[in-house]
Structure formats: structure tokens, C-alpha cells
Regions:
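Short, cationic-aromatic polyanion-contact patches
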Residues: 498-501, 550-560
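A short, conserved structural fragment
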Residues: 541-551
Length: 560
């Protein structure tokens, strides 16, 4: 426990001794939010707000503070004689001045006014402690010139402690507000067409509907293995068989695979299935939907993403899988067998292995040489049958399927088919997947005989699509990492880090960013006394977190 944490716990006990409950149970009747008070300012109006103290400037019998609520921040003014009308001034002198800290949450009753410099402010008539915080916020430091240091910007810390990220970085909350708006826009778009939102199982006896490595668990009562779903496709198609002609689900799916800036093992996808439609119809619906989302969120169809300008105005370009590969590699692979595909992969230095069949080899070529080329929305259409075990055979070419994927900024955003509804063909495709599994492909699909049985009762011609919502949200909010659009992305386990003081952490964090440097120059960047500095460096050396050495001219310090 740090010195600051000890002091806050002592203050907590002092509050209790004074009869103040630092964690009251009863509701606090908020009727105002910061941004509304600023945008609709009314002189001398009564207000009731609540929020977190983010800064304080105590000036004797008066004090300015900044309160942050869910909408923003507003300045508040504490005056001892306004708060303490009788001779007992302890509420201001003791509770406010000595026992409250930055980070504490309080409720305020007051009136609106403007300061001499015109800043909209709440004059505090009374306040109530709603939560005493026991850890200090890692607030940035600002020098006399207004330069900010030690901001809460380390990605590891931000993702691991999202609650602090939301408190300290207001723009982060904006991303997640937009995320909700995007999902609501999609839901409203589909509901207006009278499509039915449904729910299907997350725990499944067979992980079907996609080629991916699943997470496996065990049901103790039934003594059977179960899988976290990799897709809800097969269950949704069973609903189409049952006569629900247009169904969709916002589903949480799980794939036991790698993590990078575009992949998280737990992710959100929209899956939609509509009877009596085909993949051409689904392309039209998809571009209408995504254009609608862009306009609702940004007011226009063109947006800046990273350094690129992307136009979501429909219609979108279309190019076949084989034509795209020929365009960017020079190879016509449309009639190549598995051995020929493996050879050209080697010729182009594309990493492959013996478990990869024809479909995965083609996918490797496209992924390595083509997909990053598509910046504006582009439909890649007409995939080989070997890549698409759940897709209907192409109406004019039996070697292809009626499938498209939507690529934007080099990322796959959507995957759609004219759905395979021939049960005999579907079983043969599943059996081919089984053979790939025997060769070592751990992403090959399982055979789902109940799904085959449902198709044998008859599924109408159907088109289906899955849209990766996390990636779509990345694009719409100009974020280049999927972790930025997930409240709590999956993180690597923490190492057992040694316990050190907050000041030692500040020194270590700064040193880790700088690397090896001159000891005395580095020391001059802090305001610590010589005694304090010696104590901190000793603390870090004992924990083997830094090392200090000497060359011919200088004393050097570096992180271990």
C-alpha cells in the first residue's frame, strides 16, 4: 500500500468518526448534468448535480473545483459561509478541505452563476459525500507553460484499466457512445423491414457455421463437452427452415485463435438470414445498410480513416476472387490443382504447410497479395467451392460458389452467401471438411447431422450475411486497433510485478520510455530532494528494476 493510499484510509476513518457515511445507500436526486447546465445556462437557477472531483484550488475560506459527470465537466465554487450558515464551520474546514480528495464522488445542491471572467459555475449551497476513493487517480501533470506530462496514455494500462481510461480520457467514452449508436442504427434499419431479432445458443454441442478453432468446456451435469460458438449460422438457418423468413442476431462469438489489431478471441457479429433472396440482393442491402450507418454517425458518406479518405456511398465495386488474384499477382489460378497452388505459393514466398488444402492455399494467396489493396468498399465475389462449404454452387460455374466478402481498408468486414440448401451436397461438403481435419486442419468444420436433417425437411432459397461489428466500428470511429472499440479486450496475463511506491513507478515508467541515459540529467527532470531521489533509486535497484553504471565521463542509469 502506498503512502497516499494509507492517508486516504486514515481520512476514511476520520469521516466515520465524524458520523459521515462515505458510502451512503440512499439515492441522490440528480436533476442536472454538466453539459446541459453549460449549454442551457440560466442565471441563479437551482441545480442538483453529482460527480467526481477532478481538480481543486483551495483559497482559504473559498475554493474552486471541477466536477466530472457522465456528460462532461463543470466548475463549482465552495464558499465556507454559504455551506456553513451557523457557527459550526467544520463541514467546510474539516470535511471539504481536509478529508476530501481528488477522485472522490460528491453530490451538490447549488445555484448557477458566472465568475468575473465569465466562466459558468455552480455556487455550492450544500454537498454530500457519495463515495470516498481510496486510490489516487493517475492524473497528468501540467507545467507553468501548460504542457502536459505523464498522461494516462500507455496502451497496456489503458486497456487493462478501462475504468481509469474512461475517467481520464474523455474521447474514449465518445468511441463507445458511437458504438452503441451504430448498433442501434443497424437494429432500427432491420426492424423497419420487419425482420425478427432472435437469440441462439452460445454453448453448442457442435461448433458449426465457420472454419475456426473453438473454445471447449465441459458440462458437469450432462457429462458432455460443449463449445463456445464460433458462429450462430446453423441455428439461424434452422429457424429459416421453421418458417421464420427473416431473422437476425447480434451475437458474441468466440474463436480460439491469435490476437492482433484486427482480432480479439471474443467479438461481436451481426448475422442476418432472409428467405427467397440471393447474394446479389444481399449486396444491395449491405451497401445500403453501411451507407446508412456512415451518414447517421458522421452526417456524410466520406470519412477520414487513418491517413486515407474512404467513401461509403453506394454502389460498391465488385471483382471476382480469381480476377483479383490475377490482377495483383499475374497468376490465373482458376484451373490450378492443389500441387500447382502450393508451388506458386512457394514461388511468391507465401508460408504454407501440408495440412492446407486447395481452399486454404487460395485464401493464403489472396490474403497475402490482394486484400490490403482494397481501401474503398469492394465486394470480392464468386469464391471457389473449396473455400465455401456452406455456400450454394454458382448458377453458371459449378466450380464456384455464390459468395461475397466485403473488404474496406484491407479488412474483411462482411461475409455472405446464397445459402446452400441441398442436403446431399451439404453432407458431401461436410465430409470433405472431415478429410481436411484428418490432414491436420484444426479449423475444418464438424459434421452437424441435425443441421443436415433440418435441410432434408426443406429450407427455402436464402441469403445470409455476417458483418463484423467491431471492425465496422473501428472504421466508423477512426480507430486502427480493435482493442480501442472493446471496453475490455483480452489481455495477456500480468507478470508478477514487484510492489513499488507511486513515485518509484513514475521514475521507472519515464526511464523505460527513455532507455539508458545520463544519471544526473535524468535526475534533473524530477522535483525530488536528494534524500528522496536516493531513496527511490535504492528502492528500484533493490527490486532489480534499474541499474546504475559509470563510463569514462558520466554516471548512467537504465531500466533492467
Amino acid at each position: 500500500m502506498t503512502e497516499q493510499e494509507k492517508i486516504r484510509r486514515e481520512k476514511l476513518e476520520e469521516l466515520k468518526k465524524l458520523g459521515v457515511n462515505p458510502y451512503p445507500a440512499e439515492l441522490f436526486p440528480i436533476n442536472n448534468f454538466s453539459i446541459d447546465l453549460i449549454e442551457d445556462y440560466k442565471e441563479n437557477s437551482k441545480v442538483t448535480i453529482a460527480g467526481r472531483i477532478m481538480s481543486r484550488r483551495i483559497q482559504g475560506n473559498a475554493s474552486f473545483a471541477e466536477i466530472q459527470d457522465s456528460k462532461g465537466r463543470i466548475q463549482v465554487y465552495f464558499n465556507r459561509d454559504e455551506i456553513c450558515k451557523d457557527n459550526d464551520k467544520s463541514k467546510y474546514n474539516i470535511i471539504y478541505k481536509k478529508l476530501l480528495d481528488i477522485g472522490d464522488i460528491i453530490g451538490i445542491n447549488g445555484r448557477m452563476f458566472k465568475t468575473k471572467v465569465g466562466e459558468i459555475t455552480v455556487l455550492v449551497k450544500d454537498f454530500k459525500i457519495l463515495n470516498k476513493s481510496l486510490r489516487p487517480l493517475p492524473l497528468p501533470k501540467v507545467d507553468s507553460d501548460g504542457n502536459e506530462y505523464d498522461s494516462f496514455s500507455d496502451l497496456e494500462q489503458r486497456y487493462r484499466h478501462r475504468y481509469l481510461d474512461l475517467i481520464l480520457n474523455s474521447q474514449v467514452k465518445d468511441i463507445f457512445v458511437k458504438r452503441t449508436k451504430i448498433i442501434n442504427t443497424i437494429r432500427n434499419f432491420l426492424n423497419k423491414k420487419s425482420y425478427l431479432e432472435v437469440e441462439t445458443p452460445i454453448l453448442q454441442p457442435i461448433p458449426g457455421g465457420a472454419s475456426a478453432r473453438p473454445f471447449i468446456t465441459h458440462h458437469n451435469a450432462l457429462d458432455i463437452p460443449l463449445y463456445l460458438r464460433i458462429s450462430d449460422e446453423l441455428f439461424l438457418k434452422k429457424l429459416i427452415v421453421g418458417g421464420l423468413e427473416a431473422v437476425y442476431e447480434f451475437s458474441r462469438d468466440f474463436r480460439n485463435e491469435g490476437m492482433d489489431k484486427n482480432h480479439n478471441p471474443e467479438f461481436t457479429i451481426l448475422e442476418l438470414y432472409v428467405a427467397y433472396k440471393d447474394y446479389f440482393w444481399m449486396m444491395d442491402l449491405t451497401e445500403s445498410l453501411i451507407e446508412k450507418v456512415c451518414i447517421e454517425l458522421n452526417g456524410k458518406t466520406k470519412i477520414q480513416y487513418d491517413s486515407k479518405l474512404i467513401d461509403f456511398k453506394a454502389p460498391y465495386e465488385k471483382i471476382s476472387m480469381f480476377d483479383a488474384i490475377k490482377k495483383f499477382t499475374g497468376y490465373d489460378i482458376s484451373r490450378m490443382d492443389e500441387n500447382e497452388l502450393r508451388k506458386i505459393c512457394n514461388d511468391m514466398s507465401i508460408e504454407v504447410d501440408e495440412s492446407m488444402g486447395e481452399g486454404k492455399l487460395i485464401d493464403a494467396i489472396f490474403g497475402s497479395k490482394c486484400e490490403k489493396k482494397f481501401i474503398n468498399p469492394t465486394f470480392i465475389i464468386d469464391y471457389p467451392k473449396s473455400m465455401s462449404p456452406l455456400t450454394k454452387q454458382h448458377r453458371s460455374n459449378p466450380n464456384l460458389t455464390e459468395r461475397f466478402e466485403l473488404f474496406i481498408n484491407g479488412m474483411e468486414i462482411a461475409n455472405a452467401y446464397s445459402e446452400l440448401n441441398d442436403p446431399i451436397d451439404q453432407l458431401e461438403r461436410f465430409e470433405n471438411q472431415l478429410e481436411l481435419g484428418k490432414k491436420g486442419d484444426d479449423e475444418a468444420m464438424f459434421i452437424d447431422m441435425d443441421f443436415i436433417k433440418s435441410l432434408e425437411y426443406g429450407m427455402p432459397p436464402t441469403s445470409g450475411i455476417g458483418i463484423g461489428l467491431d471492425r465496422l466500428i473501428m472504421l466508423m470511429t477512426n480507430q486502427t486497433s480493435i482493442q480501442e472499440v472493446l471496453f475490455f479486450p483480452q489481455m495477456k496475463p500480468l507478470r508478477n510485478e514487484p510492489v513499488i511506491s507511486n513515485d518509484a513507478k513514475i521514475v521507472l515508467n519515464k526511464l523505460q520510455k527513455k532507455g539508458e541515459c545520463d544519471f544526473n540529467i535524468f535526475k534533473s527532470e524530477f522535483d525530488f530532494s536528494n534524500k528522496k531521489w536516493d531513496k527511490l533509486t535504492k528502492e528500484l535497484r533493490v527490486k532489480d528494476l534499474i541499474s546504475i553504471s559509470k563510463n569514462e565521463n558520466n554516471l548512467l542509469i537504465k531500466p533492467s
